[in-house]
């Protein structure tokens, strides 16, 4: 009998949530995702030193301003790591726009264009890239314009149905609803423990998946941010799941039988009219968990981006 991970691959596209190339080689996912926290972690791996050096030298050649060099080096490093990962995975890499642009539509679009240009200069076509943006109203609007240009997007830090609905209505290629972080909030708020089937994060992704399929939306649902394999098993059949190395290892070492839980409906019905900005903001604001976790996620990604920039600034000064 195939291990649990191999069983999963027959019904759900498995994506590696890591910048660790060795882990990606080990588990052979279809795609990979990165974020500022994972880039910061990857930058401390000795085998990546040459990627950092390349980013530093490139940044120095682009500007005399140290602030601009730091920004350029960060962008180039993210792309360098993405290029290395794409030598292994057959599918796509998700590369994230600076979290500090989460409420800046124009800035997000400009940064996305820059990342796509850097990938193109490295010989990577945009068809293999997903631009990650936070699921703010501004991020969703930026993604809508980018999608119309043929640049596919991955809307991340998604915690609510309102965010998911707005993403689908904007024609976003893929969303990443965060399962584990939703569970974290409810456990802290209620003091309760949840079985995998009752897990609020699992329930949220299931609702989003069913809504998309029932109304014929093509946006891919990729569950993310898992705390345990039970959550993953309950989402068998989801379009994609992005999983960190530790849980990929657990699945690879398990013989648990995988039974498909999410099944697309055969009947498609028309959806309601798209949310207006006012409706989106009200519905999102009505979910205190989503409001708190989105704000926290943006802050934490920005903090790690700042830590990475401190490291790069030190190297640029050498």
UniProtKB/Swiss-Prot annotation:
EC primary class: transferase
Cellular location(s): Cytoplasm
Active site: 132 (schiff-base intermediate with substrate)
UniProt xrefs under InterPro entries: Aldolase_TIM, TAL/FSA, Transaldolase_1, Transaldolase_AS
Gene3D superfamilies per UniProt: Aldolase class I
Matching CDD domains: Transaldolase_TalAB
Superkingdom, taxonomy of origin: Bacteria
EC numbers for this chain: 2.2.1.2
Keyword Transferase: yes
Alphabetic keyword roster: Cytoplasm, Pentose shunt, Schiff base, Transferase
GO cellular component annotations of the record: cytosol
Biological or metabolic pathway of the protein: Carbohydrate degradation; pentose phosphate pathway; D-glyceraldehyde 3-phosphate and beta-D-fructose 6-phosphate from D-ribose 5-phosphate and D-xylulose 5-phosphate (non-oxidative stage): step 2/3
A Pfam family hit: TAL_FSA
Transmembrane segments: none
Keyword Transferase included in the entry's annotation: yes
UniProt family annotation: Belongs to the transaldolase family. Type 1 subfamily.
Protein task: Transaldolase is important for the balance of metabolites in the pentose-phosphate pathway.
Quaternary structure, from the entry: Homodimer.
Protein name per UniProt: Transaldolase
Originating organism: Shewanella sediminis (strain HAW-EB3)
């Amino acid at each position: 009998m195939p291990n649990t991970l191999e069983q999963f691959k027959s019904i759900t596209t498995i994506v590696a949530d890591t910048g660790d190339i060795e882990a990606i080689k080990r588990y052979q996912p279809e795609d990979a995702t990165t974020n500022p926290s994972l880039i910061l972690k990857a930058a401390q791996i000795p085998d990546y030193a040459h990627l950092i050096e390349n980013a530093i030298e490139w940044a120095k050649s682009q500007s005399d301003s140290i602030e601009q060099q730091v920004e350029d080096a960060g962008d180039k490093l993210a792309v360098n790591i993405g290029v290395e990962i794409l030598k292994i995975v057959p599918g796509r890499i998700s590369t994230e726009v600076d979290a500090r642009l989460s409420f800046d539509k124009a800035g997000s679009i400009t940064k996305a264009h820059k990342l796509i240009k850097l990938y193109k200069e490295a010989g990577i076509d945009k068809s293999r890239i997903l631009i990650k943006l936070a699921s703010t109203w501004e991020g969703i609007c930026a993604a809508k314009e980018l999608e119309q240009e043929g640049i596919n997007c991955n809307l991340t830090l998604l915690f609510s149905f309102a965010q998911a609905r707005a993403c689908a209505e904007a024609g976003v290629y893929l969303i990443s609803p965060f399962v584990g972080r939703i569970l974290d909030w409810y456990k802290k708020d209620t003091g309760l423990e949840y079985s995998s089937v009752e897990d609020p994060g699992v329930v949220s992704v299931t609702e989003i998946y069913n809504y998309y399929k029932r109304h014929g939306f093509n946006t891919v649902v990729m569950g993310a941010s898992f705390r345990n394999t039970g959550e993953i098993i309950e989402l068998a059949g989801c379009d994609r799941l992005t999983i960190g190395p530790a849980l990929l290892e657990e699945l690879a070492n398990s013989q648990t039988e995988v039974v498909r839980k999410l099944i697309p409906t055969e009947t498609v019905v028309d959806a309601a009219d798209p949310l207006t900005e006012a409706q989106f903001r009200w519905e999102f604001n009505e979910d205190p968990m989503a409001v708190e976790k989105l704000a926290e996620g943006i802050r934490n990604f920005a903090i790690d981006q700042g830590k990475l920039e401190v490291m790069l600034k030190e190297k640029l000064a050498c």
